[in-house]
Amino acid sequence: MKLRFAPSPTGLIHVGNARQAIANALYARRHGGTFQLRIDDTDRERSRDEYVDALHTDLAWLGITWDETFRQSDRLDRYAAAIETLKASGRLYPCFESEQELASKREARIRMRKPPIYDRAMLRMTAEQRAQAEANGKVPYWRFRLSDQDRGVDDMVMGRSQVKLQSISDPVLVRADGTVLYTLASVVDDMETGVTHVLRGEDHLTNTGVQIDIAEALGGKVGQFAFAHLPLLLDEAGGKLSKRFDGLSIRALRQDGIDPVAIVSYLARLGSADDPAPLSFDDLAASYDVRRVSRSAARFDMRQLLALNRRVMHQMPFGAIRDRLPEGATEAFWMAVRGNVDMVSELRHWWDVVGGVIVPPVQDDEGAYLLQALALLPPEPWDAQTWKDWTTAVRDATGRSGKSVFHPLRVALTGEEEGPEMRDLLPLMGHDRVAERLRIAAR
């Protein structure tokens, strides 16, 4: 068994691309198969090496590893051989229409209430007419002549469907500049590298019928590939996700402090009957079943991802977060703040609270109380019992009770109305910092 993820390096991958990569990698891991990373860089104008590098970085950060990888730009000779095979069999034919001419034809067919598909006019050109067109400086592009039959697709998600090739335009496989399009390159790669299962987006379902037709024209067997087409992933507003919407790129989520475990766990089960839970890649793979994915479009909900990320953070051991903590942060710090951190990006704030510089709000009506508390502040060393001992002494001396004892002290020392347990924060702050903040807040 072999599966592949074949992104084009024309932008940063977003959660929609990542969902497909995760599905392929999990399915391969679940069934002991091979996972191939294929870079679809045949679009020479839009493909960028920087996006290839970003792709590798993002997938590695998500914990997705691949068994083999290559660029389609390194296999142009194989596509050229396939082109010659299709030309020799008469399935690939030259076309000379301009974009304007094609647009006029489409408009005319629409006016006649006919499907706006290609009319195959170039199939009726004689050899002399073709030679004359080339002599006049026209350079052909090349279309694949689809067969006149339906192509059945047994899909693990969508079920059985029929692609009516008669209602589809013969696809362009080679541009006038000689560039090979993905439609052909993908088929050649799948056949020659032994891909057995194709998991991709629902928007490729019609294209699957076309590619089956191309594969058979190149000598492929009927039923050579198993297919699973995942429903489209929509944004929160119900629109289609775009590579150019950077807010949901994997890079942006990483920079925002979302943990990769949360992203993979969320996307792996999005659109299925399984509730997302923070699981390792191996645990997700052990139970992964693409047949549990609903046929309906799934909506990416940032609130659900943040809720899952919160669970991940609250359970994370020190060893797993150590490298992402602010410099100098200890295990005691992490254990103190872990329950109040939803994203890695929030750690800097709490590190400043316990060991940096903050400006606590002045509490004019609590000044006298804070100075009384300062006078009762015990000497170090401090431990988890110090907060209780100190506030008990303050309560007894002032006659206060409940929130009126604790709240002014928390605000003075952290600048926050709520947060981690003060019994855990106090020893991390130290006597001098606590005393200074009490004086500032009492002004």
Curated annotation (Swiss-Prot):
Biological process according to GO: glutamyl-tRNA aminoacylation
Family: Belongs to the class-I aminoacyl-tRNA synthetase family. Glutamate--tRNA ligase type 1 subfamily.
Binding locations of ATP: 243
Protein biosynthesis among keywords: yes
A GO term from the CC aspect: cytosol
Motif 'KMSKS' region, residue numbers: 240-244
EC identifiers of the protein: 6.1.1.17
Reactions catalysed, as given in the entry: tRNA(Glu) + L-glutamate + ATP = L-glutamyl-tRNA(Glu) + AMP + diphosphate
The organism of origin for this protein: Gluconacetobacter diazotrophicus (strain ATCC 49037 / DSM 5601 / CCUG 37298 / CIP 103539 / LMG 7603 / PAl5)
Intracellular or extracellular location(s): Cytoplasm
GO molecular function, one term: glutamate-tRNA ligase activity
Protein name stated in the entry: Glutamate--tRNA ligase 2
Broadest EC class assigned to this enzyme: ligase
SUPFAM superfamilies recorded: An anticodon-binding domain of class I aminoacyl-tRNA synthetases (SSF48163), Nucleotidylyl transferase (SSF52374)
